[in-house]
């Protein structure tokens, strides 16, 4: 069949055609469960509509040329505290002014507040959100395809917002940048981007081995944050998806955060080979693969979940950084994070991936950030590891070992909790009690690429001073100092030290730590 010409039709299944033409005065509607795949060209002179709801999204894939505007009735979360949605336009050449006019006329579906529309941009240079208003929307131009926006529908409405534009049928790019290179908190590494196609996009290697978002863009993302960060719309923050997740597919127009590794602008790619008609919810993920294991711990205040951290085990992974499997937390001051066992550069991880051989033989530092005087508890949420593995939470200040398999760890801290060095997760086949003399002692040193200082942490857990020496590669001593144990984390300036590769040596009692540092 060379060409399919349709007058009036409703598609609630998968339709494939070589070419598709919708004639003037005719209607073609794709139900939320339907999809259209065109190997040739698409032309619309009539009315072509794609529908969706909260967890089902129709799609169209065009391999050839595409002409004529179509409509995508896209579901968007309602306005409300900690709700809203992150959305990009699933169509090209969509006027923002026309969009807000169409969705606030008659029975309005786009939320408003006075002169402000519930559509806005994120600026990572200043870490701010700005909504369009009646006075600014006229000059807003078109939605930047591939860019994400904050958006919300009216409370109690249908949740459907209509986008009118053309089908993108070629590879799309979107600029990203790291505006927090010096960790100054003036800007952020996070960029809000979106699936630019009116079809699903393969997100990770479990969805497609090579034609997926994370694999194609791996060299553009920060190695410690090589993941898709999806907004939860419930006040809990962001859920992280990477190659440790099941098959990930991104819905049409779905927006999400990614972390750039470059202080200069760089372009991410959404290739046509990533497109697929297969999917489901906004961020749809299949089950964790059978040859991998996971343990998820959650922190609660009463019955309210505050945060979680995930440990993932798979053959071939290391105790150091595994880009695409390990993933740093979106908020580096989060309530619960873990640290790498090797190559620890001070990043708090929400997903800590390691080899399968470590399931019964690992001690992982965790970071708990909590205010003094507030009860909290930590317990096992998902136990997807060996049945005989004991999970202990060590508190080396209280001298306790809590077996999480049997009950939660509970604490009302007398002082503010922060930084690494006090709490550890033990995965072991052994059995401990509080009478056993088990005290894990973290002593770590690192220099972040863009910092002008060396960070030493774990000092408060040392019995006395820690001696620090820095050597050049030829053995010449560059620096020598002693740090007390009154403050857990301390820094040493590198502003007067030349760029190069050095060796740093820490000695605390009988314990010696030697590590290579690169000073830029």
Enumerate the language-model features and the residues they cover.
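Compositionally biased Ser/Thr/Gly- and acidic/asparagine-rich
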Residues: 125-144, 148, 152-488, 495-499, ...
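Boundary/junction segments of secreted and surface-exposed precursor proteins
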Residues: 17-30, 69, 73-84, 89, ...
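Tight coil/turn sites that cap or link beta-strands
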Residues: 23-27, 31-33, 39, 83, ...
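Extracellular beta-helix/beta-solenoid repeat scaffolds
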Residues: 18-79, 164-166
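Bacterial Sec-dependent N-terminal signal peptides
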Residues: 1-23, 433-435, 491
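Extracellular, surface-exposed repeat architectures
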Residues: 53-100, 177-190, 195-198
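Conserved positions within compact, well-structured domain cores
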Residues: 84, 90, 99-153
